[in-house]
Design a protein with these regions (language model features):
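Compositionally biased, intrinsically disordered low-complexity segments enriched in Pro/Arg/Gln/His
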Residues: 2-5
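Protein-protein interaction/assembly regions in multi-subunit complexes
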Residues: 13-231, 238-254, 264-286
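Extended C-terminal regions of large enzymes
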Residues: 173-207, 213-602
Length: 602
């Protein structure tokens, strides 16, 4: 390995690679040390791609092998992994995405996020299937990655300190240093445990990947490469790309194109499943919901629509120039008692600029608001207050913001006074925008999710809205199968990688996923192969958490959902939830305590 100090200047040439399809068969291992960087390629066996596909699956495999057992998430030895997929770079819609993995500094468990961006396309042109970053630098720097490992370099960037990721990208573009950038904001620099990583403006890293990058003192990552993986059957892929694009513009995605997920808020309020004021109630009323719905936001701030890179759906709805989807809308709105559209949009903008996960930021502030109103803390913070000053305190760890930068679970441990009962998290990750007492299959999904309280790693909420499902009770005989079905489909899409908004346009995801992967890679891949791979991915995630200290006691919701019924009397029943969690692990081929594993170590 050749070490380059500072930012050595070298001539550039195009890398000539052997004919490969979809994957390059290797990763880039980047090791940071003081003011130097060493990078080298590591070849991967072909079996890894068949066993783990790519995206979050490949990333989980790499995390298992490159993260020392029990490592502190913010220690130099803890890796941050950018994992690509075999479909990335193809003409297939919604595939311009990558997975970002680490050990979460918020939960101490696996953290895997997804980001669409042109940075994803540029990064795969490094000629690798993943980038694994280990070590740490002595000062805040820009890390530049090149298709020739010896040409990777670091450059100190004190001028970028304290800037938002957007400002960093604009500055690097204006000086000609980069076109596509992965960067952190002030929250990442301060190692806030739910800081995100912004990739050409698209944030990833719920669970604190931005803090991991900040601990490595990497402000921004730029890339240069010209490698192309290609596809095995160009004509077939082009035909399927046109078909899939047409389906993506049909009825299955009409809601996302017209209104986006922000339209959920009004529906959830009507169904009484909208979390309000730290999950103390389930409705803000018809008029307030209408003000925060797309029509109200449009009237207050104007509306535009955009698309992610390489996407034909166009679900990116912006109000007053600010991107807004349901989870941000709920977390910075009703959850915190905020009903003013401008105040909501200002908080969303602040999270993007500071680099904060909106769900954890809103959940932590909602918890703090309740603590303040109960007299457990002496802070000038009440439901409905302006969130922006508090978000800035958190991002810079100023005053009470330093405590809140650790998330709800950590704050409750310090505040005490029974606050853990209403600290709304699972495994340390704040809850998404679904009321568990009124969506009890979803409640099970939140309990058992490997990342913590997570709506994206399963679609268990879909089961609660199916005909014939009693969403006010969890059935240990049926609910685990619903959760596993949606977990496995999510893992499939997240490993291929395809956007979940395509679910309705791909009625047979296992069959079509196998066809797409076969066309791209040239390998004979069947539906059964994908099902085996996804089961293997599920077990590896669980095995990783088990190695890092997980026990069955973590698969539960806070006491609020068990002891405090909703106005209609709905609550979770301990015996039912305990039985359902045990049944889930049994259905996964483990013991009822989750400790007897079905698969051998990878």
């Amino acid at each position: 390995m050749q070490r380059l100090r500072g930012h050595a200047t070298v001539a550039r040439f195009r890398v000539i690679l052997p004919a490969v399809h979809g994957n390059f068969g290797r990763i880039l291992l980047v090791e940071l040390d003081g003011d130097t960087v060493a990078a080298r390629h590591i070849e991967l066996p072909r079996s890894v791609y068949r066993d783990y596909i790519g995206g979050v699956g490949l990333g989980a495999y790499l995390l298992w092998h490159h993260a020392p057992a029990g490592v502190d998430p913010l220690a130099p030895a803890a890796p941050l992994i950018y994992s690509f997929s075999p479909l990335l770079g193809s003409p297939l819609t919604t595939t311009a995405k990558f997975a970002l993995l680490c050990k979460s500094p918020l939960t101490g468990r696996i953290c895997d996020g997804l980001s669409s961006s042109r940075f994803a396309l540029a990064a795969k042109r490094l000629g690798v299937d993943a980038v694994v970053i280990r070590g740490a630098l002595a000062q805040l720097s820009r890390l530049h990655l090149d298709e020739v490992p010896a040409r990777c370099f670091v450059r100190p960037c004190p001028e970028l300190a304290g800037l938002s990721a957007r400002a960093v990208q604009e500055q690097l573009r204006s000086t000609g240093l980069a076109t596509h950038v992965s960067a952190i904001g002030p929250a990442g620099e301060a190692q806030v445990r739910y800081a995100t990583v912004s990739n050409d403006g698209r944030h990833a890293g719920r669970g604190g990947a931005g803090a991991v990058l900040g601990a490595k003192r990497v402000k921004a990552i730029t890339v240069h490469g010209s490698a192309v993986a290609g596809v095995a059957e160009p004509a077939a892929v082009a035909t399927r790309a046109r078909e899939l694009a047409a389906r993506s513009e049909g009825i299955a995605t009409d809601k996302y194109r017209r209104l986006g997920t922000a339209s959920n808020l009004e529906t959830f309020d009507r169904l009484k499943i909208l979390p309000v004021r730290n999950f103390q109630s389930v409705s803000i009323g018809k008029l307030a919901a209408r003000r925060l719905a797309p029509e109200g936001l449009t009237a207050a701030a104007g509306h535009t629509r955009e698309s992610c890179a390489g996407c034909t759906i166009g679900c990116d709805h912006r109000y007053g120039g600010q991107r807004l989807e349901y989870e941000t809308q709920f977390a910075l709105g009703p959850l915190c008692g905020v009903e003013d559209p401008q105040r909501l949009l200002a908080a969303a903008r602040a999270c993007d600029e500071l680099g904060l996960d909106t769900i954890s930021a809103g959940g932590t502030l909602a918890f703090a608001m309740e603590c303040s109103e109960r007299g457990l803390v002496d802070w000038p913070l009440r439901f409905g207050d302006d969130l922006v000053p508090w978000l800035e305190r958190i991002a810079r760890r100023e005053g009470p913001g330093d405590l809140l930068a650790g998330g709800t679970r950590a704050a409750a441990a310090v505040i005490g006074g029974g606050s853990a009962a209403f600290a709304c998290h699972v495994k340390g990750l704040e809850l998404p925008g679904y009321e568990p007492r009124a969506m009890q299959t979803m409640a099970l999904g939140l309990c058992v999710a490997s990342r913590g309280a997570d709506h994206n790693r399963s679609g268990a909420y879909q089961a609660d809205l199916r005909p014939g499902v009693d969403r006010y009770h969890v059935d240990p005989a049926r609910a685990p199968a619903h959760v596993i079905e949606t977990e496995d489909q999510a893992a499939l899409l997240d490993s291929l990688i395809l956007c979940k908004f395509l679910r309705g346009a791909i009625p047979e995801p296992w069959r079509e996923g196998a066809e797409l992967l076969s066309m791209v890679t040239g390998l004979a891949i069947h539906e059964a192969d994908l099902r085996r791979a996804v089961r293997r991915i599920a077990e590896l995630r669980h095995r990783y958490n088990l190695r890092e200290g997980w026990t069955i006691a973590e698969d539960r919701l806070p006491d609020r959902f068990l002891d405090e019924p909703l106005a209609d009397g709905a609550r979770l029943v301990r015996a039912e939830m305990t039985a359902a969690v045990a049944a889930y692990h049994l259905a996964r081929g483990r013991g009822p305590d989750g400790a007897d594993l079905a698969e051998s170590a990878p």
